[in-house]
Amino acid sequence: MIDPKIVMAIVISFIVASILGPIIIPLLHKLKFGQNIRQEGPKSHLKKAGTPTIGGLIFIFATIITMFIMVGNPTDEAMIALYSFVGFGFVGFLDDLLKIIKKKNEGLTSGQKMILLLIVSGFLTWYAYKYIGTSINIPFLNGQINFGLFYIPFVMFYFAGVTNAVNLTDGLDGLATSVTVLVTTFLGIISYNLGHISLAIFCVALAGALLAFLRFNAFPARVFMGDTGSLALGGAVAMVALILKMPLILVLIGIIYVIETLSVILQVASFKLTGKRIFKMAPIHHHFEQLGWSETKIVSVFSIITVVFCFIAFASL
């Protein structure tokens, strides 16, 4: 039987996000918080210029509100997941805000962004090292690896990788939202099965909020999540998986994040080494756009792939 608390968390976050959307989106319009579109991107995206951004605030606020309604006194692990969610989201918010002020797709400098991300991930790494332990589970092998002191650089690299991967995935209407609904649902189920109830409520509250946000973010998007949303989502899924000692499971359930990131790495490496590009455009979702796929088709196919790999991940546990 499904725990009523889990159902209530999904329902409440969905309702709260559904209420916040029609409040926040017009406010973003009024403040002229419109998205600047990269000229080197797909030409079909130029018409999206001016679409409100920083919409990630909708599901961030909805998740926080739901957490404190459903869990009066969250556990330390739920609070640290919330901190990761909000901390990375705040860095994204600053980046988005500067892009709007400068009226171009350049916010924080790479150095500024790196310092802020290091501050957030540094605290999370310290917490993980001290309270979670340095062992992680290995999918399919039913065993663990103890990283010892190497755990610290591993986790720092891990946070950088996951947050940037989710950020890269947020390039089509509804793509990062749809994929992450599935990822957080998976993590919520695993958290619940392992007895991490507060953490499970956080995951499903986020999933419910994302489902509501999808109403505004699906093609044609009425609002973009911005770096505010994508970095927050990356921070959330990375921290939850780490708490569960399952960071490597993200390679499976976050297969789309992985593919998106690899496509960029391969594209850059190929062009620098040979002067030729592997894909028509990177990240890979733009490659499929150039092949004539609609945004809706790409999102649907990538979501189906995520579902398949979530089942594979279940089998690996």
From Swiss-Prot:
Its EC number is 2.7.8.13. Keywords: Cell cycle, Cell division, Cell membrane, Cell shape, Cell wall biogenesis/degradation, Magnesium, Membrane, Metal-binding, Peptidoglycan synthesis, Transferase, Transmembrane, Transmembrane helix. It is found in: Cell membrane. The keyword Transmembrane helix applies. One of its GO terms (biological process) is peptidoglycan biosynthetic process. It is a multi-pass membrane protein. It catalyses: UDP-N-acetyl-alpha-D-muramoyl-L-alanyl-gamma-D-glutamyl-meso-2,6-diaminopimeloyl-D-alanyl-D-alanine + di-trans,octa-cis-undecaprenyl phosphate = di-trans,octa-cis-undecaprenyl diphospho-N-acetyl-alpha-D-muramoyl-L-alanyl-D-glutamyl-meso-2,6-diaminopimeloyl-D-alanyl-D-alanine + UMP. Its main location: membrane. Pfam families: Glycos_transf_4. Its cofactor is Mg(2+). GO terms for molecular function: metal ion binding; phospho-N-acetylmuramoyl-pentapeptide-transferase activity; UDP-N-acetylmuramoyl-L-alanyl-D-glutamyl-meso-2,6-diaminopimelyl-D-alanyl-D-alanine:undecaprenyl-phosphate transferase activity. The chain crosses the membrane at residues 6-26, 52-72, 78-98, 114-134, 145-165, 171-191, 194-214, 223-244, 297-317. GO terms for cellular component: plasma membrane. It is an enzyme of class 2 (transferase). The keyword Acetylation does not apply. Pathway: Cell wall biogenesis; peptidoglycan biosynthesis. InterPro entries: Glycosyl_transferase_4, PNAcMuramoyl-5peptid_Trfase, PNAcMuramoyl-5peptid_Trfase_CS. NCBIfam families: mraY. Belongs to the glycosyltransferase 4 family. MraY subfamily. Catalyzes the initial step of the lipid cycle reactions in the biosynthesis of the cell wall peptidoglycan: transfers peptidoglycan precursor phospho-MurNAc-pentapeptide from UDP-MurNAc-pentapeptide onto the lipid carrier undecaprenyl phosphate, yielding undecaprenyl-pyrophosphoryl-MurNAc-pentapeptide, known as lipid I. PANTHER family: PHOSPHO-N-ACETYLMURAMOYL-PENTAPEPTIDE-TRANSFERASE, PHOSPHO-N-ACETYLMURAMOYL-PENTAPEPTIDE-TRANSFERASE HOMOLOG. This is Phospho-N-acetylmuramoyl-pentapeptide-transferase. The gene is mraY.
